[in-house]
């Protein structure tokens, strides 16, 4: 067993012994299908703490021919696969964490020299009877020619150089050239599997590593379910640890990934695994994933001087989606032509989620929303912070059926934030959602809830642990009247969809008069 060549199963055994272990061995069935084929180059990009390193440790333990890991994998899902035993412990594995080499050196050139030296040392120690060159490519060719066992190459944190040497384009190109020379069109490779946060860097319209099939946050392909926790997995943990699933969903859900295949499309609701595990073990909801980086990282990007960027962030804070074009993103952290490129980067970093069907980005959950507020509180977006801070009072005014205070609070938000200019009821909706930001502490907020004879504009349904709070139906009108909004709620029987809350249900009609530029509000309580 070497440090990098056939490193054994110690790391994977550590995962298996953990208090919480979710079986993701189905990934192995996917990698087995591409071994030794044109599709043997796989690159997975996900945010920090989404299980990328754990997956690499699992693959190393499964393929490593210098150890016997059958007893571990016999208990996992992969053991049900037809080709399970065919590939188990049959390959020479090279497992590398590129960050380790970057941190130990002062330049890209030094990093690559150290990498090659350490890998060649492992090869010579393992195959001391063979004459092995001091060039990594030739050394691996020599070993393969003698053993006829191809290599599984696992590279974790492959993109660390792009994150730490953000401005050094020459170093980035040389690094990509090295990877291409080492990996491309090599018979000694059965599988080249890389993981990182960023997709593979593009220069112009070309990629130096165009042989890789990429699986990212914007296009996860058939690997969507293997990184992060699925909703079913989280439900199981909630039962085991006696945690409220509805609250877990509000805090950590929100990454919507779609797998497209000839066998049928699958939609996954993916949860942040680091956060879910900590919440279960601590038996407490909080911000856990974000501790891996400070809010300063987010702040750098959302305060960039990009046309429309601030407006988009405000819209998303209000719960709206923003349509973007992900195609112009250069897959680095410095090349931004438009706000869409910045927002695409935030998707890959985990600060936004992308819906490939609507092509819209949104803030995924309460945990990440808090990170935006932390960043904005240290910026000059004072009007946004005031609106968020005042939303607590606005929610209380709604509960108290203080219609004048609700109208005044909404008006303040509209007057303070320049992007909230009204053209119709949709633009009024953005103002309402930002004004009632604090309501998310208690409610699941649904836009256009299907009801008796139509769709209610906004419904606030209290989560189970806040069942003492009233459910709320809000109907919006633009240049009409608030009383008419209440009448529409009753006429179209919107109340029917929330009849379980009768006796604790508020109806709110809100209108904006474009002539007087004022808001009016009417609030009624529905009695049994």
Model regions: which residues?
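Structural motif
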Residues: 152, 470-474, 506
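Conserved catalytic cores of phosphodiester-cleaving nucleases, focusing on short active-site segments
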Residues: 432, 456-460, 469-478, 492
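Phosphate-binding site recognition
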Residues: 1-424, 439-442
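Short secondary-structure junctions
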Residues: 436-444, 500-502
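Mg2+/Mn2+-dependent nuclease catalytic core
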Residues: 172-177, 478-495
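Active-site metal-binding core of divalent-cation-utilizing nuclease and nuclease-like domains
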Residues: 142-147, 440-467
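Domain-level recognition of nuclease-like catalytic cores that cleave nucleotide substrates
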Residues: 497, 503-528
């Amino acid at each position: 067993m070497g440090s990098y060549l056939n490193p054994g199963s110690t790391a994977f055994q550590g995962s298996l012994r953990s208090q919480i272990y979710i079986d993701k061995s189905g990934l192995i069935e996917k990698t087995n299908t591409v071994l030794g084929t044109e599709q043997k180059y796989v690159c997975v990009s996900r945010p920090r703490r989404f299980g990328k390193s754990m997956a690499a440790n699992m693959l190393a333990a499964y393929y490593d021919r210098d150890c016997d890991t059958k007893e571990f994998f016999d208990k996992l899902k992969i053991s049900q696969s037809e080709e399970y035993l065919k590939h188990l412990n049959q390959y020479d594995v090279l497992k590398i964490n590129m960050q380790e080499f970057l941190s130990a050196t002062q330049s890209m050139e030094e990093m690559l020299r150290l990498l090659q030296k350490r890998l060649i040392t492992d090869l010579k120690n393992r195959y001391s009877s063979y004459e092995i060159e001091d060039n990594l490519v030739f050394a691996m060719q020599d070993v393969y020619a003698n053993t006829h066992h191809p290599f599984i190459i696992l590279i974790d944190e492959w993109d660390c150089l792009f994150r730490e040497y953000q401005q050094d384009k020459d170093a980035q190109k040389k690094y990509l050239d090295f990877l291409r020379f080492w990996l491309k069109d090599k018979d000694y490779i059965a599988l080249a599997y890389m993981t990182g946060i960023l997709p593979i860097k593009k220069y112009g319209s070309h990629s130096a590593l165009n042989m890789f099939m990429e699986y990212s946050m914007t296009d996860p392909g058939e690997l969507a379910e293997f990184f992060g926790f699925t909703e079913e997995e989280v439900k199981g943990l909630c039962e085991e640890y006696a945690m409220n699933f509805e609250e877990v969903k509000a805090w950590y859900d929100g990454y919507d990934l779609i797998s497209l295949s000839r066998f049928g499309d699958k939609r996954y609701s993916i949860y942040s695994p680091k956060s879910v595990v900590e919440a279960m073990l601590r038996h407490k909801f909080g911000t856990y994933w974000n501790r891996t980086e400070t809010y300063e990282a987010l702040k750098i990007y959302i305060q960039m001087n990009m046309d429309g960027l601030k407006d988009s962030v405000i819209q998303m804070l209000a719960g709206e989606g923003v349509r973007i074009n992900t195609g112009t993103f250069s897959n680095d952290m410095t090349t931004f032509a438009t706000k869409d490129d910045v927002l695409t980067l935030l998707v890959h970093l985990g600060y936004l989620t992308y819906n490939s069907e609507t092509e819209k980005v949104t803030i995924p959950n309460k945990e990440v929303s808090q990170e935006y507020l932390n960043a904005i509180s240290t910026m000059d977006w004072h009007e946004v912070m005031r609106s968020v801070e005042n939303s607590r009072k606005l929610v209380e005014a709604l509960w108290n059926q203080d219609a004048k205070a609700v109208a005044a609070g909404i008006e303040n938000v509209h007057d303070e934030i320049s992007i909230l200019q009204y053209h119709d009821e949709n633009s009024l909706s953005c103002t309402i959602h930002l004004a009632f930001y604090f309501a998310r502490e208690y409610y699941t907020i649904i836009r256009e809830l299907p009801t008796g004879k139509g769709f209610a504009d906004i419904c606030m349904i209290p989560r189970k642990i806040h069942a003492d709070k009233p459910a709320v139906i809000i109907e919006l009108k633009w240049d009409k009247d608030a009383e008419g909004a209440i009448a529409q709620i009753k006429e179209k029987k919107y109340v029917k969809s929330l009849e379980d809350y009768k006796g604790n249900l508020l109806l709110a009609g809100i209108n904006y008069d474009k002539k007087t530029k004022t808001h009016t509000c009417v609030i009624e309580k529905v009695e049994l």
